[in-house]
Swiss-Prot record, chain B:
Localisation: Cell inner membrane
Keyword Methyltransferase among UniProt keywords: no
Protein name (record): NADH-quinone oxidoreductase subunit B
Annotated source species: Chlorobaculum parvum (strain DSM 263 / NCIMB 8327) (Chlorobium vibrioforme subsp. thiosulfatophilum)
Keywords: 4Fe-4S, Cell inner membrane, Cell membrane, Iron, Iron-sulfur, Membrane, Metal-binding, NAD, Quinone, Translocase, Transport
Length: 166, 189
């Protein structure tokens, strides 16, 4: 493991110690080491802990992207977390939910950046973020049908009488 | 210059047709609707800037559709924006002209196959008079397109519809390859 990954591992160990089975094993991916939140209902607790623990201080949500896993019948998010200031560790966190009607707790109260990012993930993949203050589509028009980044997405034939496909 | 061909008597009397004067006035003060959609808009702004100086043609962007006679659709028209473009177009008084600038606006550009969110050509929602190809077109190309609009205006007149004017223009059309060959020959010589 490179020094950067070792740093991330050290941060992960603190989280694992506190949350035990709610988080998965550490994946020592050299570009972006990550772990998965197995119990999605504890995601906000974990997020708050990661932000506020003095040894972790993940105060910067660099990115939150959506993911589609059709073979697992799941949707998910990937959060890239960093610390600005005291530490240089980086971690990605994955959270998954059911593909149909699934929901993930919103972390927009933990990192305000998440507000728009979660709206984007909702717009593109269609998972619901519980307790999000303003969950509306952000890129597509309000009355757009379907979620464009799902792997089985089929574009609609017309939108307000305008032909959509080529 | 249509007017300069007209006969001017020694008492400063100018003899010409109403069509001629009206069209000359219209084509010498084109006011494009001032809005841009994507990267082509940067090129459009560059064209309006001092280096290319569109004001020598009397072309100056106007911020209100009610006083514009030309719409330059510069850039990617998304489905979300398409309806707004139509609204702007409908607010413009007639006679109005539309210049579609760049591949995106002409046919969807790089999004023509996989871009679910892009209108595959602005002519699906509003009629287009002149298409300027390119991604994005250089200011020279846009100026070429604007001059084409001016030619179209010159062909129009009282009792001559846009269709007839377009037909007349088509008769005058030159083969692009021929022009290129000539220019190349001239450059070598």
């Amino acid at each position: 493991m490179s020094p950067a990954v070792l740093e991330s591992k050290a941060a992960y160990d603190i989280i694992k110690e506190r949350f035990g089975d709610a988080v998965s094993e550490f994946d020592a991916n050299p570009t972006m080491p990550f772990f998965e939140v197995l119990d999605a209902s504890r995601w906000v607790d974990i997020a708050l802990y990661m932000r506020d623990n003095s040894l972790l201080q993940f105060n910067y949500l660099a990115c939150l992207s959506g993911m589609d896993y059709p073979e697992e019948e799941k949707l998910g998010i990937v959060c890239n977390l960093e610390c600005i200031g005291k530490y240089t560790h980086k971690l990605a966190v994955k959270v998954k939910c059911q593909r149909d009607g699934g929901s993930i707790p919103s972390v927009s109260c933990v990192w305000h950046t998440a507000n728009w990012h979660e709206r984007e993930a909702y717009d593109m993949y269609g998972m619901v973020f519980e307790d999000h203050p303003d969950l509306r589509r952000i890129l597509c028009p309000e009355d757009w049908t379907g979620y464009p980044l799902r792997k089985d997405y089929k574009v609609q034939e017309t939108y307000h009488g305008i032909k959509v496909p080529y | 210059m249509g007017l300069l061909d007209a006969k001017v008597s020694n008492r400063n009397v100018l003899v010409t047709s109403v069509d001629n004067v009206m069209n000359w006035a219209r084509l010498s003060s084109l006011w494009p609707m001032g809005f841009g959609l994507a990267c082509c808009a940067i090129e459009m702004m560059a064209t309006n800037a001092s280096n290319y100086d569109l004001e020598r043609f009397g072309i100056f962007p106007r911020s209100s559709p009610r006083q514009s006679d030309l719409m330059i659709v510069a850039g990617t028209v998304t489905m979300k924006m398409a309806e707004r473009v139509v609204t702007l177009y409908e607010q413009m008084p007639e006679p109005r002209y539309v210049l579609s600038m760049g591949s995106c606006s002409n046919c969807g550009g790089p999004y023509w196959d996989h871009g679910y969110h892009v209108l595959k050509g602005v002519d699906r929602v509003i009629p287009v008079d002149v298409y300027v190809p390119g991604c994005p077109p250089r200011p020279e190309a846009l100026i070429g397109g604007l001059m084409k609009i001016q030619e179209l205006i010159r062909m129009e007149g009282l009792g001559i519809s846009r269709e007839e004017a377009l037909k007349k223009l088509a008769e005058k059309s030159v083969d692009a390859q021929q022009v290129l060959d000539q220019t190349r020959k001239a450059a070598i010589a």
